[in-house]
Amino acid sequence: MIKVIEQGSYMNRVDKLPDGLYSAECSYLGTHYECSVVFYIDARRMETVRASYAVHRTPKNDNLIEDDIPELVGQTCTFAANKIIKGLPDYDGNGFIKELLLENLRGINQAEMYMLEEMGIDGPIEYEKKWLNEKVNYCRPYTGRMPGLYDRPHYVNSLNHFRKQNLYNKYKQYTIISSGGDVVTANTTYQDSFHEMHAQLSYSLTTREITDFDMTMQRWPFAACFEMDHMAAGLFIGKNIDDLTKREVGALIGGSEGCFHLVDIVADVAKAARDLKNAGR
């Protein structure tokens, strides 16, 4: 008999508002938690003008709250805000709000290519040129100076269809399934406006060792991204799933030579596996 023992999903979107403002929303819906965050940002200065969070459900239904995060007001909404977010309180008791705040930064970064007027950039190709050096430690294509780097605007069709209202959407989901034995299987999916991938891994409940791993990439902006499809399988088999923090997964895939979206989906499953173990479920 197959039994779902844990599942969760992350949803993120970025939308344009009047007067140079944008909203970035991210939520998590899981078996034991429901949380969300919202940023309102000024793209002319790339600053947060308001940030709020909500905790709607926890295992014991404690720490339920909706409130603002004044520490982020007036701060950058770029990746430079990572350090500020990491220093915030653990609002929900399990790190979900902090993770959603970081997800929002990633979503804003992906949506930047549609904020060009506010940022004073002439067009998508000029945007890629601007980021050529600044993203050198960002992900595989930029770090490796891959051929066809300026193909991204063509791939995402921003030259023919420049998004004006809804700029970016993302959905991540995982399900951990047991068939009654010692080995459980996790299926995880990542889909956003520019990428799509699926991974499946199995691990032992007693030894915590990952016994199988496979992934498929269905959509990607660059040929260099697709190489991860062939490289990833051997990276995780034999590893202890409890050790797979984002930092550890990032190191395994080669840091900025790898795909940080793969980091996301593997680390999400590893966190869920640790949570199950710690809760005795």
Label each region the model flagged.
Residues M1-S27, R152-G180:
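Short, Gly/Pro- and small/polar-rich lid/capping loops
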Residues V4-G144, Y190-R281:
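Active-site- and interface-proximal helix/loop "cap" or "latch" segments in soluble metabolic
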Residues R145-Y150:
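Generic multipass alpha-helical transmembrane bundles of integral membrane proteins
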Residues K172, D182-V184, H195-M197:
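Short beta-strand or tight-loop elements
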Residues T185-T189:
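Short, basic/aromatic recognition patches
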